[in-house]
Curated annotation (Swiss-Prot):
This is Phytochrome A. Homodimer. Keywords: Chromophore, Photoreceptor protein, Phytochrome signaling pathway, Receptor, Repeat, Sensory transduction, Transcription, Transcription regulation. Contains one covalently linked phytochromobilin chromophore. One of its GO terms (biological process) is regulation of DNA-templated transcription. The lineage of its organism: Eukaryota, Viridiplantae, Streptophyta, Embryophyta, Tracheophyta. Phytochromobilin binds at residue 322.
Length: 1131
């Protein structure tokens, strides 16, 4: 699959991958049909090579080929199958299809000489209720009555004639219900309970171990998963597969019994696991093949049916013949495959959305192989299905962590770029370190600048690079950037002459003739198989389907392809492109030692200005801190704080009321002396973590009551804690914001103490009773109190005796829909931990109520015991935030959404402005090449200065950097004349519209003085203050610009220039509100106020200031800045 696209959004990329997979599915079908026709003459390697070019010529001959590939009518012989007519299945359970071995397995008795009537006839139209005992029929009908019939799998049934036990596994397909029957082996203890709660217990140890692993180590996670599955299943080999972006697979982890050939590191083509199989893995996450040599059993269906039965969801579905042969060739007779399905998109979306569904993708597989036939009972397989779900959740978290690391690395790109360009720009990007090869992962890079070529690392020759540049200019002139993982697939004529050295390339065009290239070698060069090596003289048969052939075929496919270019890598490349466009405009002469002295002096002055600014900000922070302290003191929730030694230094009115301890007495006491003994260890651990900077939420502890409150007992608090830090980011204390749950805890404690009379409490409509629901030991809902009814909108009679996992809380057709599959798995883990007797902590929980509103709360689960101490179910308690807190959170979400929308709108506008701006720059450059007069050239220079100022403003994405004084100024030579003329040009349209006369009173020698500093920022400041002055000048008035310049000698030949400009205007002047905003004295800034504040901060960065003077009938802005006299630098 070629990826030679100039640029592509992530959504387009996803659509492209989807289209490629759809095309690959039809190719898979053709390969399968070819295999069936070829038999023993099938050539595996050539089929894989052909599949690599999935074009119109290689499409299957008809849709029937694809249909035959997807619709098989064979099952494995270890079980049997029935299909029931879905229309009246609750009354008649009429058979419309059955497997040929069904009569033998279900109706034959065990004695040698059968009697008449021993077994009922089985055929089309048979009522299956005649085949099983009454309790079995009752269980089947109960399952068939569920909206999701698979929730109760497996269902234990007994044959009426033989009494043999079977597991019935039910699923729904179009027009029918498919029931797979798997025999219960003599050595098994039959599982009489249905659903996930019982199956979980079989994998509890492995799940607990997975959940205990620390984050940030994908290799350890995969190792643990493979080890646990190996121990749990007993198979000879367990491998973890990972699917890459191009859908090829890799064995990333493996564990085997001795004497088996290892496959670790094996890469295999995408065709080895067809797209149709991958789709089925997403639907049915466990797949078992008991014996690949076993003869398959046909399924017979009613000839009157208008449709073909689809057996894709059957646990008994027979493997395709090509897969069975592949298994046999690698000496694998039995297999068990567990699918690892993760969320495809990265963002959860709005929690209030009505349908916040995530798309899923198949991340990989955990594959078990055995050298002899092996059967795993369904309950054990179901438990193994739960295990990869937990594993998939952890994989998803690791993927998100990897994305965060990538984003963090992206933040380092500007630093790399600046380091490259600070020395000998622009040639420093190729001749210094770091250079362009350090920007992204590559094998080589090249720069074409002024018709010369600089090469780094492994690259094509200089003539070949020039040929590539010419090809890009001819065929990709419309794009300024280009990337591909295969120059051959992209259409480069001389790609074959490059050999294996260069396959992939990314490039950017800086100017019409200057370009930067990055090169990558073929993927196969970076791939090593850790499997067994050949013995002397041993050779592979490439026609034979085998892992060695798969690896060889994969190398054949990727030998002319490199690793794909990631989006974040192209972002870094584009960033360099933007910076180089400015750097390539002209080569600036290097400055002498005097320039370095000026830079040093200016940096010192800048630091002094920053320190002054910090003092000013500290004063502002002190005022803000005082206000926060006042708010905390009067808050309606308990708030307390301690210093690094654990001594209380914050104790608000609410906590004083609850504990009976006045503020003066609490201050200075150690927090551990104020909490209950039972909470000491928990609070001590919490303090230690907080002092290390680790924040924690929803921590519960009890605090003592004193004085008048002593007899009321301890106060139960749930706190969110955060570390308090000083200006140097050192932790100086801990702040606790608490929620009083004493009333709820007293109710819960009373409930636990008086369990025999729990109904009087649970069903009480007192508002202090929290929402409570419960299940029995089999997962059926057995409790749903009034508070739960009010919260969810579902009545008690609507949920009782339904499966809690799936029917009540689930992701599809459940009453209370969960946000995603991860939430469903986490709920199952919490319930099952309590069911197995393990201690559980409060966990965040959320679901959509009947009215579509998303409910967020904390879930606490307690086991329910009978008189003998056996677990008979669980009780679940929900803790909701107070209405005030919910309102605050709602307002916060609305504010975040509004800010996000504004940020998106701003990003869109900035992005849309850049393209027209590039067009304006291009038009100006074209005009510069024409025959222009002096006045016209001056207008072009003014236009260029305005364009550069606009580009600079568009790059200002973080205003806090400017406000806090951390913006880097770009120093260059300029004259005040250039700056003033450009600034005046930006306000002339406005002044002409108001008939305002602008007078330039700056002396000529000052105007022509050559200065050294950031001219664009000075121009930006001056233009804004001119605009504000004109806005508040009456029509027909006058604005006068005057200036003065003084020099202070630094050393023998360097002069520091103190520039002062005044902008005087008539009228009543600028309102005080705006001036207060300019000086940062008002937090509610208008657009004009923000503009003035930013310009004042820019002057601060230039060691300057702004003042505003009022006189009778006129007012003036006085602007000052410190620069350097540039003409003295060359002396």
């Amino acid at each position: 699959m070629s990826t030679s696209r100039p640029s592509q959004s992530s959504s387009n990329s996803r659509r492209s991958r989807h289209s490629a997979r759809m095309a690959q599915a039809t190719v898979d079908a053709k390969i399968h049909a070819t295999f069936e026709e070829s038999g023993s003459s099938f050539d595996y390697s050539s089929s894989v090579r052909v599949s690599g070019t999935a074009d119109g010529v290689n499409q299957p001959r008809s849709d029937k080929v694809t249909t035959a590939y997807l619709r098989g009518k064979m099952i494995q012989p270890f079980g049997c199958l029935l299909a029931i007519d879905e229309k009246n299945h609750m009354q008649t359970c009429k058979v419309i299809a059955y497997s040929e071995n069904e009569p033998e397995m279900l109706t034959m008795v065990s004695h040698a000489v059968p009697s008449v009537g021993d077994h009922p006839a089985l055929g089309i139209g048979t009522d299956i209720k005649t085949l099983f005992t009454a309790p079995s029929v009752s269980g089947l009908q109960k399952a068939l009555g569920c909206a999701d019939v698979s929730l109760l799998n497996p269902i234990l049934v007994h044959c009426k004639t033989s009494g043999k036990p079977f597991y019935a596994i039910v699923h729904r397909v179009t027009g029918s219900l498919i029931v797979d029957f798997e025999p219960v082996k003599p050595y098994e203890v039959p599982m009489t309970a249905a659903g996930a709660l019982q199956s979980y217990k079989l994998a509890a140890k492995a799940i607990t171990r997975l959940q205990s692993l620390p984050s940030g180590n994908m290799e350890r996670l995969c190792d643990t998963m493979v080890q646990e599955v190996f121990e749990l299943t007993g198979y000879d080999r367990v491998m973890a597969y990972k699917f890459h972006e191009d859908d090829h697979g890799e064995v990333i982890r493996e564990i085997t019994k001795p004497c088996l050939e290892p496959y670790l590191g094996l890469h295999y083509p995408a065709t080895d696991i067809p797209q149709a199989s991958r789709f089925l893995f997403r639907k049915n996450k466990v797949r078992m093949i008991v014996d690949c040599h076993a003869k398959h059993v046909r399924v017979l269906q009613d000839e009157k049916l208008q449709f073909d039965l689809i057996l894709c969801g059957s646990t008994l579905r027979a493997p395709h013949s090509c897969h069975a042969q592949y298994m046999a060739n690698m000496d694998s007779i039995a297999s068990l495959v567990l699918a690892v399905v993760v969320n495809d998109n990265e963002e959860d979306g709005d929690t209030d959305a009505v349908q916040p569904q995530k798309t899923e993708r198949l991340w990989g597989l955990v594959v078990c192989h055995n050298t002899t036939p092996r059967f795993v009972p369904f309950p054990l397989r179901y438990a193994r299905e739960f295990l990869p779900q937990v594993f998939a959740d952890h994989v998803h978290k690791e993927i998100e962590l990897e994305y965060q690391i990538i984003e963090k690395n992206i933040l380092h790109h500007p630093g790399h770029l600046l380091c490259m360009l600070m020395r000998d720009a622009p040639l420093g990007i190729a001749s210094e370190s770091p250079n362009i090869m350090d920007l992204v992962k590559c094998d080589g890079a090249a720069l074409i600048y002024r018709n010369k070529v600089w090469r780094l690392g492994v690259t094509p020759s200089e003539p070949q690079i020039r040929e590539i540049a010419l090809w890009l200019s001819e065929y990709h002139m419309d794009s300024t950037s280009f990337s591909t993982d295969s120059l051959f697939d992209a259409g480069f004529p001389s790609a074959l002459s490059l050999g294996d050295v260069v396959c992939g390339m990314a490039s950017v065009r800086v100017t019409a003739k200057d370009m930067v290239f990055w090169f990558r070698s073929h993927t196969a060069a970076e791939i090593r198989w850790g499997g067994a090596k050949h013995e002397a003289g041993e050779k592979d048969d490439s026609r034979r389907m085998h892992p060695r052939s798969s690896f060889k075929a994969f190398l054949e496919v990727v030998k002319a392809r490199s690793l794909p270019w990631k989006e974040y890598e192209m972002d870094a490349i584009h960033s360099l492109q933007i910076i180089l466009r400015n750097a390539f405009k002209e080569d600036t002469e290097s400055l002498d030692l005097n320039a370095k002295a000026i830079n040093t002096r200016l940096r010192d002055l800048k630091i002094e200005g920053i320190n002054d600014l910090k003092i000013e900000r500290m004063q502002e922070l002190e005022a803000v801190t005082s206000e926060i302290v006042r708010l905390d003191y009067t808050a309606t929730v308990p708030i307390l704080a301690v210093d690094v030694d654990g001594l209380v230094n914050g104790w608000n009115i609410k906590i004083a009321e609850l504990t009976g301890l006045p503020i003066g007495e609490a201050t200075g006491k150690h927090l551990l002396t104020l909490v209950e003994d039972s909470s000491t260890d928990r609070v001590k651990k919490m303090l230690n973590l907080a002092l290390l900077g680790e924040e924690e939420k929803n921590v519960q502890f009890e605090i003592k009551t004193l004085g008048s409150k002593m007899d009321s007992g301890p106060i139960s608090l749930v706190v969110n804690r955060c570390a308090s830090r000083d200006l140097r980011d050192n932790v100086v204390g801990v702040c606790f914001v608490a929620h009083d749950i004493t009333a709820q805890k007293n109710v819960m404690d009373k409930f636990i103490r008086i369990e025999g009379d729990y109904k009087a409490i649970v069903q009480n409509r007192n508002p202090l009773i929290p929402p409570i629901f419960g299940t029995d030991e089999f997962g059926w809902c057995c409790e749903w109190n009034p508070a739960m009814m009010k919260l969810t909108g579902w009545k008690r009679e609507e949920v009782m005796d339904k499966m809690l996992l799936g029917e009540i809380f689930g992701t599809q057709m459940a009453a209370c829909r969960l946000k995603n599959q991860e939430a469903f798995v986490n709920l199952g883990v919490v319930l099952n931990k309590a069911m197995t007797g393990s201690e559980t902590e409060k966990v965040p929980f959320g679901f959509f109520a009947r009215n579509g509103k998303y409910v967020e709360c904390l879930l606490s689960v307690s086991k329910k015991l009978d008189v003998e101490g056996l677990v008979t179910g669980v009780f679940c308690f929900l803790q909701l935030a107070s209405p005030e807190l919910q309102q605050a959170l709602h307002i916060q979400r609305l504010s975040e959404q509004t800010a996000s929308k504004r940020l998106n709108a701003l990003s869109y506008m900035k992005r849309q402005i850049r393209n027209p701006l590039c067009g304006i720059v291009f038009s100006r450059k074209m005009l510069e090449g024409t025959d222009l007069g002096t006045e016209q050239k001056q207008l072009l220079r003014t236009s260029a200065q305005c364009q550069q100022q606009l580009s600079k403003i568009l790059d200002d994405s973080d205003l806090d950097t400017i406000i806090d004084g951390y913006l880097d100024l770009e120093m260059a030579e300029f004259t005040l004349h250039e700056v003033l003329v450009t600034s005046l040009s930006q306000v002339m349209e406005k002044s002409n519209g108001k008939s305002i006369r602008i007078v330039n009173d700056v002396a000529g020698h000052i105007m022509m003085e050559t200065l050294y500093g950031d001219s664009l920022r000075l121009q930006q400041v001056l233009a804004d203050f001119l605009l504000i002055s004109i806005n508040f000048t009456p029509n027909g008035g006058q604005v006068v610009v005057a200036g003065s310049l003084t020099k202070e000698q630094l050393g023998k030949s360097v002069h520091l220039v103190k520039l002062e400009l005044s902008i005087t205007h008539g009228g009543s002047g600028v309102p005080e509100v705006l001036l207060n905003q300019m000086f940062g004295n008002n937090g509610l800034e208008s657009e004009e106020g923000i503009s003035l504040l930013i310009r004042a901060k820019l002057l601060k960065l230039m060691n300057g200031d702004v003042r505003y003077l009022r006189e009778a009938g006129k007012s003036a802005f006085i602007l000052s800045a410190e620069l350097a006299a540039a003409h003295n630098l060359k002396a």
